[in-house]
Amino acid sequence: MENQPKLNSSKEVIAFLAERFPHCFSAEGEARPLKIGIFQDLVDRVAGEMNLSKTQLRSALRLYTSSWRYLYGVKPGATRVDLDGNPCGELDEQHVEHARKQLEEAKARVQAQRAEQQAKKREAAAAAGEKEDAPRRERKPRPTTPRRKEGAERKPRAQKPVEKAPKTVKAPREEQHTPVSDISALTVGQALKVKAGQNAMDATVLEITKDGVRVQLNSGMSLIVRAEHLVF
């Protein structure tokens, strides 16, 4: 037992479980819904194997069941399975709806992170384009023109067309936003905005939670946002 290798990450534990229980866990592709209470079954079956602790098993299960591929598999008509792949009853509607909401929130978080990263890239590109005044280049001496001989006829100068000065375009005024300082003062149905980088997206308050405020974007997507990302 002392010479057994130790699994250091939840991903390694999941890979071990997929190899040990291939009819229950999978390392890739759509995952099957797990039996309720499967944690205790795991403790009983793999106790002492690979130096696994209960904490490692619990963390690996949490990562596995919150992955997108697992949430995709939690759908109407799907059947839960035990460690040997035996059916353990169909999913109820409440669990299916909970998985759907988790998947929507995860996608919304990724979308918001991508929007914030794009905004930061645009800011960095704009900052890189603002160079300091370059040193003036030395002027080359103008070639000297021969003097006109006395009595020679002077040629009329060609008149340059008068250039109109370009009209100055006023920069659009930046919209001023007021940050939300106290989420307890918000009400369900209240309109506000969600900050994503330099942009602010319109949203409506759905629920006040201990983790933040659940809002719905105009696109119909709902997500939980912390107070520092909310403005009026």
From Swiss-Prot:
Supply one GO BP term. post-transcriptional regulation of gene expression
Keywords on record:
Chaperone, Cytoplasm, RNA-binding
Keyword Chaperone listed: yes
Spell out the Basic and acidic residues composition-biased ranges: 117-136, 147-177
Superkingdom:
Bacteria
Q: Which GO terms describe its cellular component?
A: cytosol
* Pfam families, A to Z: ProQ (PF04352), ProQ_C (PF17516)
Residue span of region Disordered: 105-182
What GO terms are given for molecular function? RNA strand annealing activity; RNA strand-exchange activity
Here the segments flagged for biased composition (Basic residues) are: 137-146
What is the predominant subcellular site recorded for this chain? Answer: cytoplasm
Q: Which residues form the signal peptide?
A: none
What InterPro entries does the record tag this protein with? Answer: ProQ, ProQ/FinO, ProQ/FinO_sf, ProQ_C
Report the protein's function: RNA chaperone with significant RNA binding, RNA strand exchange and RNA duplexing activities. May regulate ProP activity through an RNA-based, post-transcriptional mechanism.
The similarity comment for this entry is: Belongs to the ProQ family.
Its recorded name reads RNA chaperone ProQ
Species in which this protein is naturally found: Escherichia coli (strain 55989 / EAEC)
